[in-house]
Regions:
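Catalytic core of pol beta-like nucleotidyltransferases
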Residues: 1-28, 38-39, 43, 54-107
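Short beta-strand->loop micro-motif that forms the acidic, two-metal-ion catalytic signature
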Residues: 48-51
Length: 107
């Protein structure tokens, strides 16, 4: 797969995979944040992703991350919306979680 080099290319690559991601992994929602959204990514940047799942994945979460890395041709940093919400309950992490939430670009 061609390595996406812009925000739009990352979003398009993920959008093209949405039906499969929903069927295989139960992804209901996926969003990008971080350097690709800010426009500060480099050739070596990973892609920061957050997903909402319809079911727990357990160890299959690793398979999801690996699949997304194949699709994007880059390492991914994968989190869930559930984790983001839990982070907001920790005063030390709330500011970062709020910043991530404000910057999300949904697929």
């Amino acid at each position: 797969m061609i390595k996406p080099s812009t925000r739009e290319e990352v979003l398009r690559a993920l959008r093209d995979q949405l039906p499969y991601l929903h069927e295989r992994f139960g992804i209901e929602e996926i969003a990008v944040y971080g350097s690709f959204i800010r426009g500060t990514h480099t050739e070596k940047s990973d892609v920061d992703l957050i997903v909402r799942l319809s079911r727990p994945l357990g160890l299959e979460f690793v398979s999801l991350a690996q699949y997304l890395e194949e699709v994007l041709g880059r390492p991914v940093d994968l989190a869930t919306f559930e984790t983001l919400q839990r982070s907001k309950s920790d005063p030390r992490r709330k500011r970062i979680a709020d910043e991530i939430e404000r910057s999300l670009s949904y697929v």
